[in-house]
Amino acid sequence: MSTFQALMLMLAIGSFIIALLTYIEKIDLP
């Protein structure tokens, strides 16, 4: 795996985690 592929993978995972956290926060809000 090249460095570029690893970087893109980390970016995709990071974006997914951020989206998941914001989704959970929206659910917790009334």
UniProtKB/Swiss-Prot annotation:
Disruption phenotype: Non-essential, it can be deleted on rich medium; the gene for the antisense antitoxin SR5 RNA can also be deleted without a visible phenotype. It is found in: Cell membrane. Keywords: Cell membrane, Membrane, Toxin-antitoxin system, Transmembrane, Transmembrane helix. InterPro entries: BsrE-like (IPR031616). The chain crosses the membrane at residues 4-24. Its main location: membrane. Induction: Accumulates by 2 hours post-innoculation with maximal expression at 4 hours, and has disappeared by 8 hours in rich media. Slightly different results were found in another study; in rich medium, expression increased slowly over time and was maximal at 6 hours. In minimal medium without glucose expression decreased as growth progressed, while in minimal medium plus glucose expression was constant during growth. SR5 antitoxin RNA is always present at levels equal to or in excess of toxin mRNA. Pfam families: Hol_Tox (PF16935). It is a single-pass membrane protein. GO terms for cellular component: plasma membrane. Encoded in the prophage-like P6 region. Toxic component of a type I toxin-antitoxin (TA) system; overexpression in the absence of cognate antisense antitoxin SR5 RNA leads to cell lysis. Base pairing occurs between the 3' UTRs of bsrE mRNA and SR5 RNA which leads to bsrE mRNA degradation initiated by RNase III (rnc) and RNase J1 (rnjA). Genetic evidence suggests an unidentified RNA-binding protein may exist that promotes TA RNA interaction. This is Small toxic protein BsrE. It comes from Bacillus subtilis (strain 168). The gene is bsrE.
